[in-house]
Amino acid sequence: VVLIELGGTAGEYQNIVYYEAYRIMKQSLPDDVLLVHVTYFPTPQHINELKSKPTQLSVKNLHAMGIQPDFIVGRAESTIDDKRKEKVAYFCNMHKDDVISNPDAESIYQIPLTFLEQKFDERILEKLKLPKKSAKIQSWKNLVDKILAKKTRRVSVAIIAKYLSTGDYELKDSYTSLLESLEHAGWHSDTDLEIIFIKAESLEKKTKKALEDLHRADGIVVPIGWGSRGVEGKISAIKYARENKVPYLGLCYGMQLASVEFARHVVGLEKANTKEVDPDTKHPVIHDIPFDKKYQTIKGIGASMRLGGYDCILKPGTLAHKIYAKHNAFKDKKKNLITERHRHRYEFNNEYRKKLEDKGFVISGTSPDDFFVEMIELPQKDHPFFIATQAHPEYKSRPLKPHPIFAEYMKAVLKYDNEHDRGTTSKI
């Protein structure tokens, strides 16, 4: 079964060609295609009643395009009662059982169970004329129980962010994969997680709130990013994590900037930088990938990115190797080979490998041809958990199976919370 999501609202001119494509597919293959129409049932506060008119109008727009939805999934603050289901079904040419209630829930992971109670899965199989199957849902129920259960521990993780503000609002959507990956690890370690978003630019300005938030964090994450805005704030947070032995996880840009921070403050290359920020830097520790035929991954205009899944060889004895070995996550254990997803156009400059390694910098993962630096870390004798990767492990974490890096990062954060005396930490 292939799922295709068409965003926006019914009738938007940008989506007309897709609606027409669906209409033709449904006409040609009536038993192989179905449409689930997600609509909103508002509840005006002054009358406290679910209203179905917006849904009726939305379906009317679909009818005007020759489309009849097979299901309506109604988003609402509360459960859609039978009376309103019957009303919607009557005006939208549907069976009442094909109007599915999708009320607000404490956790989004409860929603599959809500659908199961309404036999949504059985109705889909029936309409697609597929064999009926019993849903193997127990592991999911156990997960939901873990999510909703009162946790025995609570920790704080700071994410040094730059994609938060939009007008008067602060949204976390840009970091959804990262947030979910941290939550996955928290659920499976019986830990309640407080996420502290710290704007990188606030760290550059050294605002009181930003510094206080950084100093109270049990772990620090520097995630994906582009461009120069907020870079020095991110680097200052990395320096703080390194010097104070706060568990650190760097993702993509977080690995590149960790390399820059080490080059500046440990190796002594004061002008070290990434060419993305300073094209004329004296010490380009991070530079753009030489996209010759060997490393060209995208054809055409803007062909400048290493995108998709790539293999990596881990160095035995390193933290990275121990993490993947512990979770049996090797693609090929004999070759110490793993695979992770990527999205970057800059990379570690191999001319600086020896200079950094001579000062204790550990390159724990490289591409099979030893060209790309994929993972870096600090020796565990110097720092309990400082690891960064050019890849995006957050894209492979799953609710029932947290990514190994996030699972072990959470353990390090818990250990720090239990052992660390915040009164002795230094300031950035």
Explain the meaning of each model-derived region.
Residues 1-382, 393-428:
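N-terminal beta1-alpha1 cap of cysteine-dependent amidohydrolase-like domains
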Residues 385-391:
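Short FAD-binding loop at a beta-strand-to-alpha-helix junction that anchors the flavin cofactor
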